[in-house]
């Protein structure tokens, strides 16, 4: 796929969990009520997960798509060193997905992910109260265009 997108490893999942961006950490813990280490290690056991690396080889983030098309991504501060490269690699990953519908919710406070989702072509649907703390989240989706007429 790309020299910056790799099949997930336990090591990469632990690196991401240990170095989450503050907004991502807050989204996982406050928004979903989950422990980042447990969550990412469980996700790493799934074949559909990948991790992103920087040009220097550092772990920049981790992403996956659930069976129902629910897409997710969590990042480290490494993305700040190469924001354009990371955004392009994230787009490459999203564009490679064959699901007709990709969707999820994002913490309204997570400005980095809101900006990235817009760049990736996702549409924002509505604001909802979500999770154990009923925080404001935004539903988003992207419908794959058919190549057939």
Question: What kind of feature is each model-predicted range?
Answer:
Residues 1-34:
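Short amphipathic alpha-helix that is part of the acyltransferase structural core
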Residues 130-149:
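C-terminal "cap" of GNAT-fold acetyltransferases
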Residues 88-102, 111, 120:
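Conserved acyl-CoA
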Residues 39-52, 60-61, 98, 135:
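A short helix-loop-beta-strand connector motif used in the catalytic cores of GNAT acetyltransferases and
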Residues 72-88:
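A short, internal acetyl-CoA/4′-phosphopantetheine-binding micro-motif in the GNAT/acyltransferase core
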Residues 55-70:
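Conserved beta-strand in the GNAT
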Residues 103-118, 129-132:
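Conserved beta-strand-loop-alpha-helix junction that forms the acyl-donor binding cleft
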Residues 61, 126-129:
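A structural microfeature
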């Amino acid at each position: 796929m790309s020299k910056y997108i790799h099949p997930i490893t336990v090591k990469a999942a632990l690196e991401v969990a240990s170095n989450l961006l503050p907004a991502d950490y807050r989204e996982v813990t406050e928004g979903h009520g989950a422990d980042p280490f447990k969550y990412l290690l469980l996700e790493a056991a799934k074949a559909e997960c990948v991790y992103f690396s920087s040009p220097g080889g550092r772990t920049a983030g981790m992403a996956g798509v659930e069976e129902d098309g629910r897409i997710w991504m969590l990042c480290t501060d490494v993305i700040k060193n190469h924001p354009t490269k990371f955004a392009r690699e994230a787009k490459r990953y999203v564009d490679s997905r064959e699901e007709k519908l990709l969707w999820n919710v994002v913490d309204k406070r997570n400005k980095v992910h809101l900006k990235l989702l817009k760049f990736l072509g996702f549409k924002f649907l509505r604001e909802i109260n979500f999770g154990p703390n009923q925080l404001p989240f935004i539903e988003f989706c992207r419908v794959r265009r058919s190549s057939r007429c």
